[in-house]
Regions:
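Interfacial helix-loop-helix junctions of multi-pass membrane proteins
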Residues: 24-36, 49, 102-125
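Membrane-interface loop-to-helix entry segments
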Residues: 56-77, 119-133
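Membrane-interfacial loop-to-transmembrane alpha-helix junctions, especially the N-terminal start
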Residues: 4-8, 88-98
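Helical transmembrane-bundle signal
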Residues: 12-22, 71, 75-78, 101-108, ...
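Structural signal for the C-terminal ends of transmembrane alpha-helices
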Residues: 79-86, 137-145
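Extracytosolic (periplasmic/ER-lumenal) interhelical loops and adjacent juxtamembrane/interface segments
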Residues: 26-62
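N-terminal signal-anchor transmembrane alpha helix
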Residues: 4-31
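Transmembrane-helix motifs of polytopic, lipid-linked glycan transferases
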Residues: 71-94
């Protein structure tokens, strides 16, 4: 049970941390710090020296992208963990986390490629809120009896 608490707790923490770093991206004007997607700049997946967008903006955006990989790993661990449980509710919520994170990657790319058009930006935030709600539900159900 402690392992389940740790796995779901880390997932919830990382989902929340991603919203915080996404807010930092938005508040610092770093949304196009990496002006291409999936690469950061043409020909490089990481920021490059003397990047036109500035190193600070590039690294803020790149850091947000990197955190997504830690989050995806955490969600995959949660899926693997709940596969052996008999709890369909946990399996569904964990699988939705993985699918939602992958969807966030695509939506993040659309957001960059549309030069931060308000609709994909809003969709990106809305999906983040849904993913946090799902992670919170996983965490709150960690000790709930199976029905």
């Amino acid at each position: 049970m402690r392992l389940r608490t740790a796995i779901f707790g880390v997932l919830l923490f990382l989902q929340s941390a991603l919203v915080v770093t996404g807010g930092a991206v938005r508040l610092t004007g770093s949304g196009l710090g990496c002006p291409t997607w999936p690469e950061c700049t043409p020909g490089s997946y990481t920021p490059v020296p003397h990047q036109a967008e500035g190193q600070l903006h590039a690294w803020i955006e790149f850091g947000n992208r990197l955190l997504t990989f830690a989050l995806l790993l955490s969600a995959l661990i949660a899926v693997i963990y709940v596969l052996k449980s008999g709890r369909k509710d946990l399996r569904t919520l964990a699988a939705a986390q993985v699918l939602g994170i992958l969807g966030q990657g695509v939506l993040g790319g659309i957001t960059v490629l549309t030069d931060l058009h308000p609709l994909p930006v809003a969709g990106h935030l809305l999906l983040s809120m849904l993913l946090i709600a799902g992670a919170a539900s996983l965490y709150s159900r960690r000790e709930a009896p199976q029905f």
